[in-house]
């Protein structure tokens, strides 16, 4: 179901790890000699909004991806706490690079911030740290095929004591797909990621509107 869920947050000070097991990879296809397929997640917000007159500079830190999903191979969930990589089906870039680029590109168009950057952290007012904690396709007998994505977001203000966290949220979404195949799973992730970014934008817009001096 395409329902965005909000979950508990865990600070990124703790390194992202996983207790889930990985099964031996059985790549889809008839032979390991088959050419690999490469995928990207690409979302577009559309037109850029007018920038808020007192918007701040936001630094987007490199997105962190929890250990079992940070490699280029797509991953299926095939059982309780069991995941299986698909070596013949990979992201074109690392998930960290893909999500960082897409997140920055979306946020710069929201107009909430005067600028959204991915370098020169020290010139920014705010720092956004993001974690991808789930990124898999569901392929379990008796369960509906789905693309699952879960993300956590934290914004700190560099002008406050100890870079205090001023905004945090956790969002997840399960997108139903016809069949668990690599193209379907990636398309589901793309749909889900766009919905998560739209929800994040609404939350950020509300927060900064309510906390902007009138």
Short names for language-model regions:
Residues 88-112:
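N-terminal leader/targeting helix
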Residues 1-21:
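Sec-dependent bacterial lipoprotein signal peptides
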Residues 20-96, 207-214:
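A structural "domain/chain start" motif
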Residues 104, 108-112, 137, 201-209:
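Sec-exported extracytoplasmic/periplasmic mature domains
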Residues 57-62, 75, 127-133, 148-154, ...:
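Soluble periplasmic/extracytoplasmic beta-strand elements of cell-envelope proteins
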Residues 82-89, 159-201:
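Short secondary-structure boundary motifs at beta->alpha junctions and helix caps
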Residues 22-49, 109-162, 179:
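Surface-exposed short loop/turn segments
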Residues 96, 100, 104, 190-193, ...:
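Extracytoplasmic/secreted envelope proteins and their assembly/folding machinery
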């Amino acid at each position: 179901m395409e329902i965005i869920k909000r979950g508990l947050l865990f600070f990124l000070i703790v390194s992202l790890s996983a207790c889930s097991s990985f099964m031996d990879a059985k790549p889809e296809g008839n032979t390991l000699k088959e050419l690999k397929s490469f995928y990207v997640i690409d979302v577009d917000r559309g037109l850029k909004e007018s920038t808020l007159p007192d918007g701040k500079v936001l630094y987007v830190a490199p997105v962190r991806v929890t250990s079992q999903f940070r490699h280029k191979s797509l991953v299926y969930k095939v059982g309780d706490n069991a995941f299986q990589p698909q070596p013949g089906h990979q992201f074109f870039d690392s998930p960290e690079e893909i999500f960082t680029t897409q997140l920055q590109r979306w946020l710069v168009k929201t107009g909430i911030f005067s600028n959204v950057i991915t370098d020169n952290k020290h010139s920014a007012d705010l720092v956004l740290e993001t974690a991808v904690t789930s990124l898999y396709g569901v392929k379990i007998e008796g369960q509906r095929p789905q693309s699952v994505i879960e993300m956590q977001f934290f914004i700190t203000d560099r002008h406050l004591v100890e870079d205090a966290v001023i905004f945090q949220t956790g969002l997840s979404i399960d997108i139903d797909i016809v069949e668990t195949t690599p193209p379907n799973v990636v398309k589901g992730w793309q749909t889900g990621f766009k919905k998560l970014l739209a929800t994040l934008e609404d939350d950020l817009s509300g927060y900064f509107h309510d906390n902007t001096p009138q």
